[in-house]
Amino acid sequence: MQSSPLTSTLLFHIGPVAITRPVVTTWVIMAALALVCRFVTRRLAILPDGRQALLEGIVTSVAGQIEDVIRKDARPFLPLLGTLIIFLVVANLSGVLPGVEAPTSKIETPAALALIVFFSVHYFGVRERGLRGYLASFAEPKLIMLPLNILSEITRTFSLMVRLFGNIMSGEFIIGLVVALAGLFVPIPLMALEILVGLVQAYIFTVLATVFIGAAVGSVAKG
């Protein structure tokens, strides 16, 4: 039977904090990514070998996407957005592994990621414009728009969370249902589709985060 996507399996407590299966899966993914990054970035050279050339190509591609949207130097935003898309790709695709639930298929992980984006948007906005200038941007183009602009900040964060959660959760639910009804090998084409959906959702989430940051720093229109 499929468990509710709004509830997670409780594993243990650290003090008053409940540690659930998606939390542990997230920790494992973070540790694995840290080890991989440590390994692949050792012994970087002026003349890159194939591994380094591939890494530089990925970084350049992500930086190019950021600059296309924000129209500013990508370096201040690259650590956040680059980490975000790498984590999302791995987290979304982890559900393909037997016995592993993608942490993004449970509501707490998309909610946490959306909150990270929410606070990062305001951080970059204040850093770029100053506190007064950034707060004044909520009254643009007219003061009457202030409540709507504040509401927009909240609703777009909520939609960012729901979009990621809904797409990944529904993919896992459908595959689990087909496995229960038809056997192990039938859902293989659906798993390929889930991989595609996971990659697309990682890209969309990161692009939307980039757009929100661009709006905060004044590079793209708010909306």
UniProtKB/Swiss-Prot annotation:
In terms of CDD domains, this protein maps to:
ATP-synt_Fo_a_6 (cd00310)
The UniProt subunit note reads as follows:
F-type ATPases have 2 components, CF(1) - the catalytic core - and CF(0) - the membrane proton channel. CF(1) has five subunits: alpha(3), beta(3), gamma(1), delta(1), epsilon(1). CF(0) has four main subunits: a, b, b' and c.
What's its membrane topology?
Multi-pass membrane protein
Does this UniProt record's set of keywords contain Cell membrane? Answer: yes
Q: Which domain of life is it from?
A: Bacteria
Q: Which UniProt keywords apply?
A: ATP synthesis, Cell inner membrane, Cell membrane, CF(0), Hydrogen ion transport, Ion transport, Membrane, Transmembrane, Transmembrane helix, Transport
Q: Where in the cell is it found?
A: Cell inner membrane
* Name recorded for this polypeptide: ATP synthase subunit a 2
Source species of the chain: Bradyrhizobium sp. (strain BTAi1 / ATCC BAA-1182)
GO CC terms of this entry: plasma membrane; proton-transporting ATP synthase complex
What protein family does this chain belong to? Belongs to the ATPase A chain family.
Among Gene3D superfamilies, the record links this protein to:
ATP synthase, F0 complex, subunit A
Q: Which InterPro entries match?
A: ATP_syn_F0_a_bact/chloroplast, ATP_synth_F0_asu, F0_ATP_A_sf
One GO BP annotation is: proton motive force-driven plasma membrane ATP synthesis
Q: What does this protein do?
A: Key component of the proton channel; it plays a direct role in the translocation of protons across the membrane.
GO molecular function, one example?
proton-transporting ATP synthase activity, rotational mechanism
What sections of the protein cross the membrane?
17-37, 77-97, 106-126, 173-193, 195-215
